[in-house]
Amino acid sequence: MSVSLVRRVIIALSIAAFGSGMSMRIMDPMLVQLSLDFAIPLGMASWTITVFGVAYGFAQLIFGPLGDRYGKVKIVAWGCCACSLAALFCGITTEFTGLLIARIFAGITAASIIPLAMAWIGDVVVYEHRQSVLAKFLIGQILGLSTGVFLGGFSVDFFHWRLPFFFICVWFAAISAYLGLVIQRLPKSTHIIQLGEGVGLSRTVGEFRQVLNVAWSKQVLLTVTLEGAAVFGALAFIPAHLHTVHNVSLFSSGAFVVLFGLGGLAFAFRSRFWVSRFGEVGLIRTGALLMCTALLSLAWIPFWWWLMPACFLFGLGFYMMHNTLQINATQMAPERRGAAVAAFASCFFMGQSLGVAINGSLFSVVGTPVLLSCSGLLLLIVGSRFAQLRQLRITH
């Protein structure tokens, strides 16, 4: 298969990841408006984020083995088609319960995209080049996360919170059609299909058991669960923090959070430099330290102008740490890479849901400064521990 064809497929998958990123974070700046429109507490409004993450996490247990069995890119293409319908349902529902159901559907369908795309890259790109290729692929997701927050805040302030979902609907429909055409040009050698033993549920359980039988897998999965809880448990409430503590408009608070994505881009575009400069262990340690510093600054420094570099450093630190965890995930169980990366993504999003749910319940009790501080300190502890374990694994 030609390098140019691989590049085109990766770009297409990155565009799909852009849509997935928008879906993930589109609700963050909408929470205040949702609480007003539906006459519900802010913590209850945050369930639109929580249910997406829970659905996304559990759905990985299905899509990972499906990708291994039927072809990863094919499942991504069909998943994008379903994502288009899910976004449409989010935009047309008129009840909060209906919105929650639509967000569950959106989480399930979005689960088919990024992990299987990462697993396919793991199939076709050698390990030595995989981290930089994955970083470039994730540019789509990074931009999607930032665009989702920005678009959500912009629509709430100037139009209507439903508007972005129709844009997401069209986006997924277009990329689904394109991927359907690309699949026909892929040689059979790229459709790596692994058939597990048994049938149905027993086969799926067996594939995940193979992943968990690897001791290092447990360490990676625990770390990414705690990382997801701390990072996105904080990120979901940064717009509310800026709005309530610094009197920043919802649109502007969404724009501030875009800087989180720009920090990620700073890592992705210079990934070869960061990897060669710090190595895996250094990226974990530096990323955790940057995130802790950024969140403590956001929580307690009273100067609004510091919010901009703090959000940027938060994003840079996150992608330093998370990209390194991702590269470890692709190599946890190479013979079951789809299931392994799916387990990784499942733990990540279950962690996100846990973090948002906990912070949502504590928001009115302790306030956002305490929530952001606790998240930052947890990231420092988790990152330092994993860096130490990774160093021991390298030296032994």
Predicted features by range, described:
Residues 39, 71, 92-98, 109, ...:
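Helix-breaking motifs and short loop linkers at transmembrane-helix boundaries and internal kinks
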Residues 281-325:
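C-terminal transmembrane helical hairpin of 12-TM major facilitator-type secondary transporters
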Residues 98, 126-127, 136-183:
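Helix-loop-helix hairpin linking two adjacent transmembrane segments in secondary transporters
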